[in-house]
A protein has these predicted regions:
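Acyl-donor (CoA/ACP) binding surface of acyl/acetyltransferases
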Residues: 2-43, 77-189
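Conserved GNAT-fold acetyl-CoA-binding loop/helix
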Residues: 41-63
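Secondary-structure boundary/capping residues
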Residues: 42, 51, 70-73, 138
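Short helix-to-loop capping/linker segments positioned immediately adjacent to catalytic or ligand/cofactor-binding
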Residues: 45, 67-69, 114
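A short helix-loop-beta-strand connector motif used in the catalytic cores of GNAT acetyltransferases and
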Residues: 64-79
Length: 189
């Protein structure tokens, strides 16, 4: 039997590195989250596209808060901050406990691209998944044209497993997707 998401509440809410702090996103972060999701550069490879208005974002973030309030969290939505400045979002969605797997996603503010933030935040979430949640596998997908995300996923040690044809409904049309994963036994970088 695996108890993959039952560690103390304080460990669930904050992840830190020497530069970044990841905290569970909430409605108090609404203005930043809406701004971040409204950038067309950020939404280019996002299947959710740009939210119509702040109320759409509010509903999403409210559902995140509901997920975070559960005793056993199944979906983590973290705000990434550098110092006091929010710079992005990263999430970990857990699958059925029997499979011990999760899927990660992230969005970084365009002004913060190419600064190693996504890589550093992803490493923190991988540590959470493998070291604390005792996952066996963490996966991620990205559009084949999303060269920045491809570099991030490979930099943290994820392995490209395959290509899904026309699986992502992007604002520009259907896109192929690369599927990546890392196992608990794989080297992490």
């Amino acid at each position: 039997v695996y108890f993959i998401n039952t560690f103390p509440l304080t460990m669930k809410t904050t992840l830190t590195s020497s530069r970044l702090t990841l905290t569970l996103a909430s409605l108090k972060d609404l203005a930043f989250i809406h701004e971040l999701q409204s950038y067309h550069q950020s939404a280019e490879f996002n299947t959710l596209a740009v939210p119509e208005n702040e109320e759409v974002t509010r509903k999403s973030v409210s559902s995140w808060e509901e997920c975070h309030a559960k005793e056993a969290i199944e979906q983590y939505h973290f705000k990434i901050s550098e110092g006091e400045n929010p710079v992005g979002l990263i999430g970990l969605n857990l699958g059925a406990a029997r499979y011990r797997r999760g899927e990660v996603w992230y969005t970084i503010h365009p002004s913060q691209w190419k600064k190693g933030i996504a890589t550093e935040a992803l490493n923190l979430v991988l540590d959470l998944g493998f070291d604390h949640l005792k996952l066996h596998r963490i996966q991620a997908g990205c559009a084949v044209g999303n060269l920045g995300s491809i570099k991030v996923l490979e930099k943290v040690g994820m392995i490209k497993e395959g290509r899904g044809r026309q699986i992502l409904p992007l604002s520009t049309g259907w896109s192929d997707n690369y599927e990546y994963s890392i196992l608990e036994s794989d080297p992490r970088k």
